[in-house]
Amino acid sequence: MRLTASAIAEQFGLTVVGDGTTEVSGVATLAHAGAGQLSFLSNPRYRPQLADTQAAVVVLRADDADAAKGTALVAKDPYTAFAKIAALFDVAPVREPGIHASAVIDPTAQVSPGAHVGPFVSIGARSRVGDGCVIGTGSIIGEDCVVDEGSELLARVTLVTRVRLGKRVRIHPGAVIGADGFGLAMDAGHWIKVPQLGGVVIGDDCEIGANTCIDRGALEDTVLEEDVRVDNLVQIAHNCRIGAHSAIAGCTGIAGSAKIGRYCLLGGHVGVVGHLEICDKVVITGKSVVRNSIHEPGEYSSGTPLTDNRTWRKNAARFKQLDVLARRILAVGKEKE
């Protein structure tokens, strides 16, 4: 597919600087783009690459347009504009409707004639797969699940039981949705299992990364509202609620019954203690541990910044002495009084 700069600008409301007839057939980074490819400049640190890039068209802000040596497309947010343009060239393989001969489907399950069910798929009792859905190779849909219109389970996705997916949900390989929550009670020195009788509800337009686990609720459902984006290797425990338009980076763990607001961003390897609440529009930076509820929007951190090992060891040794030092300072203050 080849598109002119003018056609792209018209489709996405951008401004052309230079030759609008310039054609592009793909996308790439500034450093590696070649003839006929489109790139973008969003981070100022890459501005020096404008002078050397071979990109036919660059998406950038108005104040960077003078530095572009070829055709430019001016956008208020170049990264978002690039994402929309790149989607034009991201041509997914066509999945024809139909059920592969190796699939095993319970007689009580309902599969739309417009759905694609791949090899070695299993669909359990009373589950429903909507129109335009793609159920990839080796995926398992357990009992009483719903996969709504246009949703896609890539290879080896497991919906254990009582999982309801909204429209246009995309789940990447290896994810497990609806497994038992980690509910245990101690009885006479032995653990007994607390039955997990709830389910999982995932709203429209959500995306779940590879090997992520979302447990079903004990009594009430675990809920992800619409347009939540979850990276790979994330654990969301039972009874959690994640607000709409929030994004969670890889290796994050969210303990049971935590409630996270709308438009929140959780960096990589964040830990969230259970039974707390985070309000809307909160950013938690990577490696932080959230131990208390957050009631004010803003950016929060508790991770330890990287430093050289020798300095870190000195700081760690001093950290263990903080209580002694604090007592000494307090004592000196009292002596001066």
From Swiss-Prot:
Asked whether the keyword Transit peptide is assigned, the reply is no
Q: Which keywords accompany this UniProt record?
A: Acyltransferase, Lipid A biosynthesis, Lipid biosynthesis, Lipid metabolism, Repeat, Transferase
Q: In which pathway does it act?
A: Bacterial outer membrane biogenesis; LPS lipid A biosynthesis
For this chain, one GO molecular function annotation is: N-acyltransferase activity
The GO cellular component terms are: membrane
Q: Matching InterPro entries, A to Z?
A: Hexapep, LpxD, Trimer_LpxA-like_sf, UDP_GlcNAc_AcTrfase_non-rep
Report the top EC class in one word. transferase
A Pfam family (short name) is Hexapep
Q: Which GO terms describe its biological process?
A: lipid A biosynthetic process
Q: Which reaction does it catalyse?
A: a UDP-3-O-[(3R)-3-hydroxyacyl]-alpha-D-glucosamine + a (3R)-hydroxyacyl-[ACP] = a UDP-2-N,3-O-bis[(3R)-3-hydroxyacyl]-alpha-D-glucosamine + holo-[ACP] + H(+)
Residues of the active site are: H238 (proton acceptor)
User: What EC number(s) does this enzyme carry?
Assistant: 2.3.1.191
Subunit relationships: Homotrimer.
Task of the protein:
Catalyzes the N-acylation of UDP-3-O-acylglucosamine using 3-hydroxyacyl-ACP as the acyl donor. Is involved in the biosynthesis of lipid A, a phosphorylated glycolipid that anchors the lipopolysaccharide to the outer membrane of the cell.
UniProt family annotation: Belongs to the transferase hexapeptide repeat family. LpxD subfamily.
Q: Tell me which NCBIfam families the record gives.
A: lipid_A_lpxD (TIGR01853), PRK00892.1 (NF002060)
UniProt-recorded name of the protein: UDP-3-O-acylglucosamine N-acyltransferase
* Source organism: Xanthomonas euvesicatoria pv. vesicatoria (strain 85-10) (Xanthomonas campestris pv. vesicatoria)
For this protein's source organism, the top of the classification is: Bacteria, Pseudomonadati, Pseudomonadota, Gammaproteobacteria, Lysobacterales
